[in-house]
């Protein structure tokens, strides 16, 4: 379509990530005409990035533990998952010819671990079903006359739609289109948006120059992280992390990012204690390290007697001064409880995902904006977060399905004169 202003017969879906594609599929399955608009030259770019190291589609963790991974929004996301949970997602992928398996960690992957075949099959099926794709259409908000306003290579254009699903992503991948540029447009129309923050992100610590230069990129595993929540309750989680030039990142840190962010906001910094020797208790470490060292260096002694070397040994040197490094009891205690003070989260554009977004209380159960009848929101632009491990993708799919079905139902009711008379033109 090249007209400066055009009118769609049904639903406009804005955003070609998993949430938008699923919304388009759900609405089209309900018989609605669907036009999907994508800012980039092709859809699913972040989805493809997620598949670079092996596409983690979902997780095999059973309910209610699975839903609990969504933290403060567990109840709301659980409702979406009842319609489209991890097993339904695997069945859906199978319908596209992509079988999956459960890895040793409980994560679910396609058999070939690739994202591209699934995405190609999905887009092909959507096109066969009649979904119309419009790439290089970057949404700018609404025109003065209520039309959806897009920037295209041919210039700006307006599109009037009876209903719209917004699946615009969070703010953590600006190079792929998820830049949070939609926030002001939605706030101007009465939707409350929780500020976007980095989630599944690294944190700054402030290493010495020596440590940063020698050990950036080094794995720190296995470890057990200990921390306290806002009530003073202690928690522990085993996993692995990676030293960076400025601090730490990795799956263990990502799993704690919400709690760490909250602590930094509350106290100015967050404390994390790492057990660097989870296979040995303190008394055993004291005995092992108390053996005669002879002429061996401290590094060699730690390696031989406690299996501690590389970045773990360097962390001990970061934490203790020269006097303490001569005391094997102090070293043993530090190995079991190495203190790390986290100063700040890394910037949003470095994060895997974002927290914050459209506050769910401003939407109805069908994810329609209460202030904008006919406008639905889905995916990472909503105010929820989850750790890596397949939980992010699953909720994006599930919220897209919920929004697409709800939009189709709203359009049917409106056509029958049963619903509100307002449209998605605002």
Role assignments for model-derived ranges:
Residues 163-209:
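Glycine-rich loop(s) and the adjacent beta-strand/alpha-helix scaffold that form part
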Residues 135-147:
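A conserved short coil-to-beta-strand element within the FAD-binding core of flavoproteins
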Residues 12, 28-52:
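Glycine-rich FAD pyrophosphate-binding loop
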Residues 29-30, 40-42, 63-65, 82, ...:
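Residue-level recognition of phosphate/Mg2+-coordinating polar/acidic sites
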Residues 77-85, 104-124, 173-178, 205-208, ...:
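Short beta-strand to alpha-helix junction loop
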Residues 12-14, 37, 139, 158-174, ...:
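Short hydrophobic core segments
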Residues 4-19, 35:
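Beta1/beta-strand and adjacent pyrophosphate-binding region of the FAD-binding site
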Residues 23-26, 182-189, 394-412:
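An active-site-proximal "capping" alpha-helix that borders the catalytic cofactor pocket
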């Amino acid at each position: 379509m090249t007209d400066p202003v055009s009118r769609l017969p049904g639903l406009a879906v804005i955003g070609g990530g998993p949430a938008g594609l699923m919304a388009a599929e759900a609405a089209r399955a309900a018989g609605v005409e669907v036009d999907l608009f994508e800012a980039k030259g092709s859809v699913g770019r972040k989805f493809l990035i997620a598949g670079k190291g092996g596409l983690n589609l979902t997780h095999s963790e059973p309910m209610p533990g699975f839903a609990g991974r969504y933290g403060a929004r567990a109840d709301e996301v659980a409702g979406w998952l009842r319609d489209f949970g991890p097993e339904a997602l695997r069945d859906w992928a199978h319908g596209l010819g992509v079988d999956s398996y459960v890895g040793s960690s409980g994560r679910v992957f396609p058999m070939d671990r690739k994202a591209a075949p699934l995405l190609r099959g999905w887009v092909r099926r959507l096109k066969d079903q009649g979904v119309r794709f419009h790439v290089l259409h970057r949404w700018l908000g609404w025109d003065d006359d209520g039309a959806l306003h897009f920037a295209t290579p041919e210039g700006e254009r307006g599109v009037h739609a009876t209903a719209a699903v917004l699946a615009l992503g969070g703010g953590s991948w600006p190079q792929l289109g998820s830049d949070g540029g939609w926030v002001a447009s939605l706030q101007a129309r009465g939707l409350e948006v929780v500020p976007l923050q980095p989630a599944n992100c690294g944190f700054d610590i402030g290493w010495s120059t020596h440590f940063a230069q020698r050990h950036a990129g080094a794995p720190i595993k296995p470890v057990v992280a200990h921390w306290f929540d806002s009530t003073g309750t202690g928690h522990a989680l085993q996993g692995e992390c990676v030293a960076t030039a400025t601090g730490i990142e990795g799956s263990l840190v990502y799993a704690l990012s919400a709690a760490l962010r909250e602590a930094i906001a509350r106290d100015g910094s967050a404390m994390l204690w790492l057990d660097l020797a989870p296979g040995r208790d303190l008394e055993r470490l004291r005995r092992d390290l108390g053996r005669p060292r002879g002429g061996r260096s401290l590094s060699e002694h730690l390696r031989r007697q406690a299996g501690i070397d590389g970045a773990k040994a360097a962390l001990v040197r970061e934490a203790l001064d020269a006097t303490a490094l001569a005391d094997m009891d102090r070293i043993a205690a530090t190995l079991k409880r190495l203190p790390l003070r986290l100063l700040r989260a890394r910037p949003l554009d470095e994060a895997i995902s974002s927290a914050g977004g459209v506050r769910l209380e401003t939407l109805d159960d069908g994810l329609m904006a209460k202030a904008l009848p006919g406008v639905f929101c889905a995916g990472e632009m909503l105010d929820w977060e989850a750790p890596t491990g397949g939980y992010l993708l699953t909720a994006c799919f599930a919220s897209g399905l919920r929004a697409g079905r709800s939009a189709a139902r709203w359009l049917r009711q409106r056509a029958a004169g049963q619903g509100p008379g307002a449209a998605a033109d605002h």
